[in-house]
Structure formats: structure tokens, C-alpha cells
A protein has these predicted regions:
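Short linear clamp-binding motif
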Residues: 3-16, 340, 344
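Structural alpha-beta junctions
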Residues: 53-61, 127-138, 196-206
Length: 347
């Protein structure tokens, strides 16, 4: 398979799994309450266990189901909270690590090997479903398109879709945090703040940690693909902001107290405010080092953040959401943008 074909496969997998592609018509979908999510989780894990047994029987390394991710990661806590027992989620995402045999430390080459791993295990998954027809699934619906979007049959009636979010061993711990939103807040909010920070420094803060892309010794955006060298800045979710400071200064810096308090985030306690505080600490650190103006950096990041929030709501509107849903999104945007603004202007 050519490099371009592998890149296209990588894009399609991420497109389906980040854009929330749905196979199920509304009348077949179960409402995703905490109880339903946890029932679907057990059925999905049972399906993966069967797949892994089949892989082992052929001397193929098994995949590793890491954890629920996205908003549904809070289902266990929400089920125990009487005030949130009836909350519903937009979808169910499960983080799964596909084995990859790395033959080089070069990140560009490693990404090609990771894409090959995705292709291999996606094809094996499809073959397993066709041959074994696991009883946890609606086989026909699952095989209808991308098999990483698994249609689980709920014994009491109806179906749910579990989206397999693919990662690889070096990024498992990072992805536990990066794909976790703040509880009760849409994931696109934190996603836009990561993006605004990354865009300011021409870095990517995504599925493989914090990456810098170089062409002709200059950092370039992810839109530039040809003749690009990739450098890993951080895969440590608890320390990635400190790692960015080290990268930007070449290691010659004294962390601001705010950055010491918020060097990254706790995957178990992700919040917009914690990320904003860490970004503010990073700005103060780099200003003290004489690299940039803290106020200018925070102002530009905030402007990009706001544009991203507005674009997200605009995309939702084109999907015919109700006025009530639109108003709810606008309220979330207003509340979270105020939190970020207050932090950025208060340091």
C-alpha cells in the first residue's frame, strides 16, 4: 500500500471517529443513559475478548481495550449520582490500542507503521465478524461501513453504536486525558482550547501528543505534508505544558509558580479552567524568559478559541439541531469563554 493510501486510511478512521458518523437510524437507537452505556461497555468488552482469543489462536498479538473515552467516560460516576442518573450522552467512544511493530525511532516512519497496524487490525476485525458473527453485535449493521463503528445489540431491545477510537502503545496514557472532556461540558470546548494553543506555537496537540513539524528547519502546520520531519514535544498529559516550555526555551527557563501548579492536567479531572490556568502559567514563564509577551499570547489564543467555539455551533446548526439544543450550546460557549477570559486577563 502506498504512503498516500495509508494517509487516506488514517484520515478516514479519524474522520469517522471524530465526526461522530452514525450507522443507526433514530428509531433504532437506544437513549444513551449511564446505565445503557455501562451495559454496552460490558457487551463491547465481551466482543473484544472474543476477537482477542481468535487472534491468539492465529498467533497474532491481541489489541488492548484501554477505557471508555469522551463524555461517556463519566457514566460510572453519573450512575451513582442521583442528579445525573438520567443524563444522556451523544455517543459511546472506547479507546483501544492496536499493537505496532516499530522498526525505527523516526516519527514519520513510525506513523506509516501505525497506519499499517490500523489497516491490518481493521481487516482482521472485519474477517472475525464475518466468520464468527459474534452475538453481541448486529453483524449486518456493523459490516455496513467502517467496522470500527460497532453496533451493539442490547438484550432488552434496541441498539447502540460504540466507536472504536484507535491509539497505539506509546500514546495510551496521553489519550486517556486528551480525549476526555470536562464533565458536563462538550468535548469541542477543550478541543478548541488545545487547538488555539497549538496554533499559536505552530504545534499539534492531538492523538499523538504534542508534535512539532519541520520543513527546511522551520515549524510548519499540519496542512504541510510533503518533506516534513516530525518531532515529539510531549506525550505526558500530566506535564505537557511544562514540556512545551522546555521545548520553546531549549531547557533554559525557570517555571512560573502558576506553571508549576498546572504543568499539565490530571486525566481523571480534566477541566477548561485547569487548562486555561496552565496556558497562563506557560505564557508567564515564556515572558519571564524574554521570548514573548504574555498578554499578547493569551489574547491571540483567546481570540482563536472564541472563533473555534463559534464555528462548532455553526456546524451543529447545519445538522438541523433544535432551538433548545442551539441555546444550550450557546450557553455552554458563553460560560466557558468567560472562564477562560477571566483567567487570561487576571494573571
Amino acid at each position: 500500500m502506498s504512503i498516500n493510501s495509508l494517509q487516506n486510511l488514517r484520515f478516514l478512521v479519524r474522520y469517522y471517529l471524530t465526526e461522530g458518523g452514525l450507522k443507526l437510524p433514530p428509531e433504532d437507537r437506544r437513549e444513551l443513559t449511564p446505565e445503557t452505556v455501562l451495559e454496552a461497555k460490558e457487551l463491547y468488552l465481551s466482543f473484544i475478548a472474543g476477537f482477542n482469543s481468535w487472534l491468539r489462536s492465529q498467533n497474532i498479538s491481541p489489541i488492548n481495550p484501554v477505557s471508555l473515552t469522551g463524555s461517556s467516560i463519566y457514566a460510572p460516576k453519573d450512575r451513582e449520582n442521583k442528579e445525573r442518573q438520567n443524563v444522556t450522552y451523544g455517543d459511546i467512544d472506547y479507546l483501544v490500542s492496536f499493537p505496532t511493530e516499530y522498526t525505527t525511532g523516526d516519527l514519520t516512519s513510525r506513523r506509516k507503521q501505525e497506519s499499517e497496524s490500523v489497516k491490518k487490525y481493521t481487516e482482521l476485525l472485519e474477517k472475525y465478524i464475518q466468520i464468527k458473527r459474534p452475538n453481541q453485535l448486529d453483524v449486518e449493521k456493523t459490516l455496513r461501513s467502517n467496522v470500527l463503528m460497532v453496533i451493539i445489540r442490547i438484550p432488552a431491545g434496541g441498539f447502540v453504536q460504540v466507536d472504536t477510537v484507535v491509539t497505539h502503545p506509546p500514546y495510551e496514557e496521553w489519550m486517556k486525558g486528551r480525549y476526555t472532556p470536562q464533565r458536563g461540558v462538550k468535548g469541542y470546548v477543550t478541543g478548541n482550547l488545545y487547538k488555539a494553543l497549538g496554533d499559536y506555537f505552530t504545534l499539534t496537540i492531538g492523538t499523538e501528543g504534542v508534535l512539532a513539524r519541520y520543513k527546511d528547519k522551520e515549524r510548519v502546520s499540519s496542512k504541510v505534508r510533503k518533506d516534513v520531519t516530525i518531532k515529539s514535544v510531549s506525550t505526558n498529559f500530566k506535564n505537557f505544558l511544562m514540556d512545551i516550555a522546555e521545548y520553546m526555551t531549549g531547557g533554559d527557563f525557570t517555571p512560573d509558580p502558576l506553571l508549576l501548579q498546572h504543568p499539565g492536567m490530571d486525566p481523571e479531572n480534566v477541566s477548561v479552567s485547569s487548562l486555561a490556568l496552565g496556558i497562563a502559567g506557560l505564557a508567564k514563564t515564556l515572558e519571564e524568559r524574554g521570548i514573548l509577551s504574555s498578554s499578547e499570547m493569551l489574547s491571540k489564543i483567546y481570540e482563536s478559541f472564541i472563533v473555534g467555539l463559534e464555528e462548532n455551533v455553526g456546524k451543529k446548526v447545519t445538522k438541523d439541531i433544535t432551538q433548545s439544543q442551539h441555546d444550550k450550546l450557546m450557553k455552554i460557549n458563553q460560560e466557558q469563554s468567560k472562564i477562560v477570559k477571566d483567567i487570561f486577563t487576571g494573571v
